[in-house]
Amino acid sequence: MSLHSPGKAFRAALTKENPLQIVGTINANHALLAQRAGYQAIYLSGGGVAAGSLGLPDLGISTLDDVLTDIRRITDVCSLPLLVDADIGFGSSAFNVARTVKSMIKAGAAGLHIEDQVGAKRCGHRPNKAIVSKEEMVDRIRAAVDAKTDPDFVIMARTDALAVEGLDAAIERAQAYVEAGAEMLFPEAITELAMYRQFADAVQVPILANITEFGATPLFTTDELRSAHVAMALYPLSAFRAMNRAAEHVYNVLRQEGTQKSVIDTMQTRNELYESINYYQYEEKLDNLFARSQVK
């Protein structure tokens, strides 16, 4: 694969920042905003695709094609490496997992995480989760690794076992997943900082901490996560939640006041939007490329 492969870029980012802050980008515009803010890697949440693109809950309803559409839109305009939530692999067989891996590589993703929940999955921070056997998840990991067409594409294992089977069993599963070929680990819904260190010591691969709001995991700081040997800090829906609250407020104000004057100062200006999407460069190219056709 080329030196500019997304997977290689993601691995390089891990060496430059500790922990690597990875922010969720719900769409291509947000990916560009994250890039302008100086982030080195971005994320596409499965729950974000469901809620943001489809208006549906994160209950395994989204399809692979739904996710691929959003991946392509982001990677078409943003050069930051994109980590993608692949849920359980979008199907019950190893061939489904393999197709997911190959398709995401073609779409420009840097890596994915695949989890050990059952097909009727739930949000990782909701109660009543159910997980497959350790052996079935190992098969998912093996299928994902075997399907890689880019050796630098990242296969990350997510385990939801802590809430279902307890810490010791979750660590045992994590070790099996790494032995099967997972290169990084995402232990979901961690409740204590020290647990991250226990996972890190047990598996000796980079650990991702999901610092999502309003869930089971406290909002640990990057300093705290670094002390626990966490390599990646993920903020999957932070900007999306803020965007939704801002939109809701503007809609209500417009409805109640009949004008947007009282909220205009909270808005991104036209010029700021144009700068974030490189509008002026496109316009200049348009003028240069098609100037002759405009002369009558």
From Swiss-Prot:
Keywords linked to the UniProt accession: Lyase, Magnesium, Metal-binding
MF terms in GO: magnesium ion binding; methylisocitrate lyase activity
Binding site for substrate: S45, G46, G47, C123, G124, R158, E188, N210, I211, T212, R241, R270
EC number: 4.1.3.30
InterPro entries assigned to the protein according to its UniProt record, in alphabetical order: ICL/PEPM, Isocitrate_lyase_ph_CS, PrpB, Pyrv/PenolPyrv_kinase-like_dom, Pyrv_kinase-like_dom_sf
Enzyme class, first EC level, given as a word: lyase
Gene Ontology biological process: propionate catabolic process, 2-methylcitrate cycle
Reactions this protein catalyses: (2S,3R)-3-hydroxybutane-1,2,3-tricarboxylate = pyruvate + succinate
Keyword Magnesium: yes
Pathway: Organic acid metabolism; propanoate degradation
Cofactor(s) required, per the database record: Mg(2+)
Binding annotation for Mg(2+): D85, D87
Role, per record: Involved in the catabolism of short chain fatty acids (SCFA) via the 2-methylcitrate cycle I (propionate degradation route). Catalyzes the thermodynamically favored C-C bond cleavage of (2R,3S)-2-methylisocitrate to yield pyruvate and succinate via an alpha-carboxy-carbanion intermediate.
HAMAP family, A to Z: PrpB
Subunit comment: Homotetramer; dimer of dimers.
Similarity comment text for this entry: Belongs to the isocitrate lyase/PEP mutase superfamily. Methylisocitrate lyase family.
This protein's name: 2-methylisocitrate lyase
Organism: Escherichia coli (strain K12)
Gene name linked to the record: prpB
